[in-house]
């Protein structure tokens, strides 16, 4: 499990870096998003992953990796929005937004490690495309 934790921390660091850069550029503009808007964004990203896998080509020079990063970040935004509720404007500082990001990333890590213990990392035995399809189906189910 040590490798899983390190892999998670590496991926979250990449996601956090992009979140921080966008926060610097735009501020917490996402605070105005309602839960349905956040899940719509996650659905759009998951659907693009499926489209890229199906078609095998893209017209926009951004691959699947960027979409997964966006899904992680929108997921954390969604958790923040559920905690704070949506706002009429960007009502928190960048520092507060980053602290909330870190809080939910830590909670996700703890939950993943607990589930990995109980399920013995069964997800590692799944075929990658099945894992992605399952992820997309779950997004669609909750949207």
Feature roles, as predicted:
Residues 140-143:
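Catalytic phosphate/metal-binding cores of nucleic-acid and nucleotide-processing enzymes, i.e., regions
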